[in-house]
């Protein structure tokens, strides 16, 4: 499964450390190692390398698998970074986190595919993190159900919660 996350408007230049949106996103992703994180941007043209971007958000580090950009004018078809990446990776399951003011193309794409779209009116705050966590749980469960590959919920020898 791929999680598309708007880098420039939800992560870049925001508070860093334990209270920032990158740390909040890392915490949400922790239980889901099978989720590939792809950062998106609104400008035209290639983004810096994955290693450069990892340096900008060290809280996410190796969780960043790829960076995607819009291949056309930034005000047209903003969802193309998603459709292009899905075609290239042949991935069916995805979710996206985008700011409210840039949601029109994403809403249409998510509606067509049934993918969850987390809209952020106030940045990637706690409320958005909770909505993302619930969406990831649903999508990962569905992906595992369809593929027949289930991750163990607990390691051998680990105590189960009462």
Which role does the model predict for each range below?
Residues 1, 26-27, 85-90:
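Short amphipathic alpha-helices and their capping/turn segments at secondary-structure boundaries
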Residues 61-162:
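C-terminal cap/substrate-recognition subdomain and adjoining C-terminal extension
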Residues 2-76:
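Alpha-helical substrate-recognition element adjacent to the catalytic core
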